[in-house]
Amino acid sequence: YMEEVKQVSINGGGNLAQRWGTTRIGSGGLDIALLAAGGAIASVKAVLDRKVDNAYALIRPPGHHAEPEEAMGFCVFSNAALGGMYALSEGGLDRIAFLDWHVHHGNGTQAVVWEDPRALTVSIHQENNFPPGSGGIEEIGAKDGTGTAINIPLPPDPLVGFTTSLEIFSIT
């Protein structure tokens, strides 16, 4: 996959996601995607090194749709998952959790840690949206990671979805 991204980037850009056709990069796109992934990792590192109390990585391209071997939904690399895996491998953490609250399912983050018992993913998203067929409550992880994926698909009605989101977070 990395070689594909590299070649498309070197050859002037183009489409990476053949399955959904939603991820294009331009010439030099690999460098930009690597900067975004590095930004996510640097944010995690800053928190682990206690340089900051918390961090928000405002990066493009985003990452929650990119799967281990496939770009998707404008995402080249699964940046949050890369940051989380950095925390596990270099930060001395035993467990991590990802909260993905977005209209689309966080399929890429979920796919990266699908079998990892150290990583919990919670995705709150609109049901039957993007990617098609993804994010059902039956998706719970696999092997040692069974039970570590929690999907909360909300109805497509914006008012119902918003109200339900507030109830999930107990925000009044």
Named regions from a protein language model:
Residues 1-172:
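HDAC/HDAC-like amidohydrolase catalytic core signature
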